[in-house]
Amino acid sequence: RSTLFPYTTLFRSKTLDKIKEAYGGVLFIDEAYSLYSGSQNDFGYEAISTLIKEMEDNRDKLVVIMAGYPDEMERMLSMNAGIRSRVSYTIDFHDYSSEELVEIFTMGAQKQGFVLLEETVAKLGEVFEAAYANRDRHFGNARAARSLFEQTKLQQSNRLALDEEADLFTILPEDIKEL
């Protein structure tokens, strides 16, 4: 027995408690690969072993969704034969297009009462096209659109502080910065 035994037993118990909380619903594990370092002597191995057993024994009570970057997820599934056989479906979600990112930004702005000029929408298209063309595996997708919107509101506030007559709810092209 390892000196970690009491801790791994406690960790297994806490993992099982969390899994049981999801009975009748969905257990969502974001960046699931971060659970497992590849060693059988870590807590992540215990978490995955516990998860595999629950996925098998209680498949009628539990839906498990694991999310993460494709390469890391594939590595995780390859590290444990038991988990691969219990994962029925894998779905690859593609990045949003630049047009979809403009739409996400625009919907968020309109929801908060902002007006975007045609020129502003055109500038958004340019910014998102550049971001999309230069994206890497950490590209933020909808998060990038929301982040740009938050930056834009700050930029717009700075502009409004210098121009008392400007419309408070109109976003101008100069309010949009590069991602």
Residue positions per predicted region:
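Short, small-residue-biased leader/transition segments that mark boundaries at the very start
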Residues: 3-10
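Conserved nucleotide-binding/hydrolysis micro-motifs of P-loop NTPases
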Residues: 4, 33-35, 69-74, 95-101
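Conserved alpha-helical scaffold flanking the Walker A/P-loop in AAA+ ATPase domains
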Residues: 11-28, 48-57, 82
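Conserved RecA-like P-loop NTPase ATPase core
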Residues: 15, 30, 51, 64, ...
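Conserved catalytic/switch belt of AAA+ P-loop NTPases
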Residues: 33-65, 71-84
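Conserved C-terminal "switch" segment of AAA+ ATPases
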Residues: 75-78, 84, 93-138, 157-163
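C-terminal helical "lid" subdomain and adjoining coupling/linker elements of P-loop NTPases
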Residues: 131-179
